Amino acid sequence: MTMRWDDFRRSSNVEDDRGESTGGGFSAAHGLGIGTIVILGLIGWALGIDPSVLINGAQILSGGGAPSQQTTQAPVADDARTAQTKDFIAAVLGDTEDRWTDMFTAMGRTYHPPRLRLYAGAIDGGCGMAQSAMGPFYCPQDKNVYLDMSFFQDLQDKFGACSDDKACKFAEAYVISHEIGHHVQDELGVLPRVMAKQQAASNSVEVNALQVRIELQADCYAGVWANRAQQKHNFLEPGDVDQALQTASAIGDDRLQKEMQGYVVPDSFTHGTSAQRKRWFLSGFNSGQISACDTLSASTL
């Protein structure tokens, strides 16, 4: 079985930049990602990453980016599978726009949707140079979500988060809605406050601890979206939520570090443990309430 998404409204905020090629060397993008980042190059302590434990799952949060690079645009021809994936992304993004617009309206606020930029290999954006190895991420500087669609194949091949294309659909929706969760944090003013605290932190342990809370809140917001979308569309099939939980488990810091280096360094966590990611996603999914996602003041994560 697979989630039913045919009646989701398609967003017009998907920008296909896969034909864009970028010159120059690599420069780490400073964005908020779901947890498959492999950073190449020098990373300062202020970014909250311990270079000795760089793993898929590391996180960068900083202002500014690399200088703009010259780009060229070439047409991209899609096969049927790629075209369907693009349609799915537009559908999920469209529904996040609708659900968060409703929730913001109920709070007396206006929701300003982000753009989602599709790319292949590498792209230059508001947070610097992005490469596909970084995984999906949100850039606070230009308020765009960046996604290389090859990441969805990685969910199957590298992380074992799901077994096939159909089984992966809700896991993929979780990935997208997590990144939108970061944009929601930006809209609510949470990100600027946390970034200021990170910049004032005296060491990387404090920076990472704040980052974990930000990432877990985005997981919770992904759950809130799923709850509201289910109420609206009744789109979930048996096993869909399990797939999202399996994905959250597959990209927990503890599991990634254990697989990469054979041991776990809790002080270096930037996204939370597998159990924490599952717990906070379910907090949002079971309640459907933003108030259930206060990871910043929670005494226990």
Sequence positions of predicted segments:
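A Zn2+-metalloprotease active-site environment signal
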Residues: F8-S21, G25, A29, G33-T270, ...
